[in-house]
């Protein structure tokens, strides 16, 4: 086991990793930008190092400074959290070359699954269903249009190196295809440094279902069932739950088996998430793999009683998986709401500033993962996530009642938050019935504004 872990992140996930390390008896190192000097992860770590100015590229994305911080403090492992450098194969490579353990998969695994076209080829080789699309990146507009006509409109054009909804454009007919294709390539180049794109059939009302997996260095891979992340805005998840209201035990076993097969094929080590689209007819299609811990991992923890972050650290240290589970031990129902410093009525415009009052919800089955406090200033430089409210109940109705109560009693003043908006979603008949899909908010834009 390690002795000291550097957490190459900030905010709630940095605190989450520090907590897991402390439970395992490990010392921790926080790195922070000048804007995050007053952050709680800095206060709770055993050591802390300022790694630069507020912009991410000068701090949380600055690989040499993070490695230097690890060497100065004697850290023998680095946990990347999510976002920033978590899925950067070059970072994982440099960490290893510096004789420090990267808590996550190998650089090769990050590359294999981080490139969507490569991941799709692996899925097809294993006969895991994929959405009909181009076999790899399309090189020219002419080739792309031929492929689109073969697949059948509507199609979605996606960045090969992408994620987070960037570099994605939908074309409903040949007339609008050229414009969508060129825009997707421009966005892909700006966001990811590569203008390669591929095409897929566009599904009208799919659900977003993902499988949590964990692999060890002894060749064992387990899955911990599904999460439903269908409530999204521009491919950004807002509410997640487990289990999915749309997945029965037979489908759960089929999707879980497909996810494990993919992870086993590359000898995957650590926590990962394999994302699928579930069509209205019950067909599921592999979409992509995230080679890191996810923001929404707590809903799985609440339903399985496993600490996924502690397990990540253990398997990175070479220990075998501490549990045996493949889809059979879900306990009750969990829901997570992401509370952001954003104004839904103004196109989710960020709302940085001073938090003047803060009171989190509590009670049985309620968990709040957060880094904020009264007097904390939300900086304008980073993701606007303030807190994750996670509830667990014996069944979905109990979990829903707990979440509504939790949001009603959650006080954050000084900045605009998404709490009222989340409350409106939780009262919507489609959400109550468990029938939402990824286009739900596009059809219900009135939910973004306070009723007059």
Feature annotation, model-predicted:
Residues 1, 164-165:
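An N-terminal boundary/leader segment
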Residues 146-156:
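Acidic/histidine-enriched active-site and ligand-binding environments that engage anionic O-linkages
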Residues 1-126, 138-146:
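ATP-binding N-terminal substructure of ATP-dependent carboxylate-amine bond-forming enzymes
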Residues 133-134:
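Conserved beta3 strand of the protein kinase N-lobe
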Residues 7-26, 48-50, 71-73, 89, ...:
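ATP-dependent carboxylate activation and anion-phosphoryl transfer catalytic cores
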